[in-house]
């Protein structure tokens, strides 16, 4: 009876939501999105344009007499990012084996999965501050990168395992009786190209993330950009390290693109006798490049491990922190002030996330559409290069430049994160659009259909599952970024975490952070439940 109230039958085993319920949902979603826009976008600051122009002028008038020590900071960055990313990736592979529902029994995978969800719920701000207070800069940076890489690679690699065809794994597991051996031979070795791609994308993201790490006082070349933009803003000290950082990031992007396109990408090989020599030669070069890649990776990781100072600065600090962290202050929750009550802070954070994610989805589709193969190659490549340059510009620099233009910092943060996430997810949407059936697209073109018509009636329909996945991933990501930018006014809750930690008010810190963690855990469990339903884990793998 309840089913008939909401759905109507369109086939033997297929039901569809009744149109007026669908319309009601659309109206409700639009109302929430519009409210979030109104609540989070402030007016343009009419006096800020001159400040913005002066900041741009100062940025492009570098101080040539300042000593920057670029080589040392760049080498330090390469060491701790590579070493931390590699260490986190190794642990992610192991944990993904134990958390994949299609590989492990449900009673094993679920508890370990929940542990990783809880660990991921700790704000990056919190661990960044903890590590930077306990260890020296290089060790703190390595641990933060490792922690971040481990938790997020575990999530994505586990999803990859659960979406894979594991027939050969189960057959080998039954024959040999060893689950890990079967996993190693049928999944890890056969899919190692795809797994290395996860590492490359993680490595690239971590290099771009180094400037944000410097907020915690962690070293690296990002520190040369963050320090002049902190208390006493000095744009004239930013350009030279910025050019070096952007050049280095573009080099990393090019290396990742070449490795992912020619070394780690699975391509079908033409084994005709006439081309056999070419195929063998190609395999040989791929093997040589792969060996060189591994040698460089291990060398940088070992260099990082050797040069780290492993001393702990203040062991008692950690004990004091956790003794106070779980002593929640009930008076904060009874306040009606959204700047004090943690629950009201979460409501505000949610409206910020909704306003941002709605724009990210729109601009991701737009950017992906403009840079896909529907347009002339020269135009799409030019736009991809533009997105690349936008993506590698540090977010903190964009914030300092754009902030005078608006009356409230929260508007600036949303625009900065929109630029960052829109360009990143736009690249992903472009890849998905380019996988569409070219024959169908040509058929639309032959019938005189416009590019906009093809986007709306074919590309978006075909990529609906990808768009849903991107939206869920982006929602989780933008919430964490809003928290991270709290020290710049990005979110009340992020600002409170920063202030309470700096003042050593760890009981107040716990009162704000624990509800936030529960909120993040709830969101991830909801997304996980949707995914479990899609892979039918309860039906096929509950044993």
Swiss-Prot record:
Which GO cellular component terms are attached?
plasma membrane
Q: Which residues cross the membrane?
A: 18-38, 78-98, 115-135, 141-161, 211-231, 237-257, 288-308, 354-374, 379-399, 413-433, 482-502, 510-530
The compartments listed are:
Cell membrane
Annotated ABC transmembrane type-1 domain ranges read 74-256
Q: Which GO terms describe its biological process?
A: transmembrane transport
Location (main, coarse): membrane
- Membrane topology qualifier: Multi-pass membrane protein
- Disulfide cross-links: none
**UniProt keyword annotations, A-Z:** Cell membrane, Membrane, Repeat, Transmembrane, Transmembrane helix, Transport
What's the domain of life for this entry?
Bacteria
Provide the family line: Belongs to the binding-protein-dependent transport system permease family.
- Record note on domains: Composed of two homologous domains.
Biological role: Probably part of a high-affinity transport system.
Q: What is this protein called?
A: ABC transport system permease protein p69
**Organism of provenance:** Mycoplasma genitalium (strain ATCC 33530 / DSM 19775 / NCTC 10195 / G37) (Mycoplasmoides genitalium)
Lineage of the species this protein comes from: Bacteria, Bacillati, Mycoplasmatota, Mycoplasmoidales, Mycoplasmoidaceae
The protein's gene is named: p69
């Amino acid at each position: 009876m309840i089913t008939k109230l909401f759905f109507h039958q369109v086939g033997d085993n297929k039901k569809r939501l009744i149109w007026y319920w669908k319309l009601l949902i659309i109206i409700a979603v639009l109302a929430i999105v519009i409210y979030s826009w109104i609540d989070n976008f402030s007016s343009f600051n009419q006096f800020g344009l001159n400040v913005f122009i002066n900041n741009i002028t100062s940025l492009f008038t570098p101080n040539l007499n300042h000593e920057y020590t670029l080589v040392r900071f760049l080498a330090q960055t390469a060491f701790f990012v590579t070493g931390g990313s590699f260490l986190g990736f190794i642990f992610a592979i192991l944990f993904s084996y134990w958390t994949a529902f299609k590989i492990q029994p449900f009673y094993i995978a679920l508890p370990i999965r929940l542990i990783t969800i809880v660990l991921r719920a700790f704000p990056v701000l919190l661990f960044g501050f903890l590590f930077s207070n306990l260890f020296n800069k290089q060790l703190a940076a390595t641990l933060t990168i490792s922690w971040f890489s481990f938790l997020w690679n575990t999530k994505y690699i586990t999803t990859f395992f659960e979406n894979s065809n594991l027939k050969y794994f189960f057959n080998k597991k039954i024959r040999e009786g060893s689950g890990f051996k079967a996993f190693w031979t049928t999944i890890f070795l056969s899919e190692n190209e795809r797994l290395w791609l996860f590492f490359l994308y993680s490595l690239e993201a971590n290099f771009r993330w180094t400037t944000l790490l410097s907020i915690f006082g962690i070293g690296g070349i990002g520190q040369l950009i963050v320090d002049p933009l902190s208390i006493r803003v000095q744009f004239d000290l930013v350009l030279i390290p910025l050019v070096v950082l952007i050049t280095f990031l573009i080099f990393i992007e090019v290396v990742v693109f070449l490795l992912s396109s020619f070394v780690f990408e699975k391509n079908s090989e033409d084994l005709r006798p006439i081309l056999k020599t070419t195929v063998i030669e190609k395999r040989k070069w791929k093997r040589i490049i792969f060996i060189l890649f591994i040698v460089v990776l291990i060398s940088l990781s070992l260099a990082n491990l050797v040069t780290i100072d492993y001393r702990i600065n203040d062991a008692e600090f950690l004990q004091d922190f956790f003794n106070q962290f779980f002593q929640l202050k009930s008076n904060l929750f009874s306040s009606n002030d959204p700047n004090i009550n943690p629950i009201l802070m979460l409501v505000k954070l949610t409206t910020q996330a909704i306003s941002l994610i709605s724009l990210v989805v729109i601009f991701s589709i737009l950017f992906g559409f403009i840079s896909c193969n529907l347009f002339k190659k020269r135009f799409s490549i030019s736009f991809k290069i533009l997105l690349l340059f936008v993506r590698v510009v540090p977010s903190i620099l964009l914030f300092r430049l754009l902030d005078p233009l608006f009356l409230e910092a929260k508007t600036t943060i949303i625009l900065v994160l929109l630029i960052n996430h829109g360009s990143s997810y736009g690249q992903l949407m472009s890849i998905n659009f380019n996988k569409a059936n070219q024959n169908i697209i040509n058929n639309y073109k032959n019938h005189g259909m416009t590019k906009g018509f093809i986007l709306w009636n074919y590309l978006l329909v075909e990529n609906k599952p990808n768009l849903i996945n991107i939206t869920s991933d982006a929602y989780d990501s933008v919430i964490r970024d809003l928290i991270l930018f709290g020290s710049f006014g990005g979110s009340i809750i992020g600002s409170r975490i920063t202030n309470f930690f700096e003042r050593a008010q760890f009981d107040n810190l716990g009162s704000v952070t624990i509800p936030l963690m529960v909120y993040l855990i709830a969101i991830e469990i909801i997304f996980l439940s949707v995914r479990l339903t899609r892979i039918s884990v309860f039906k096929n793998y509950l044993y």
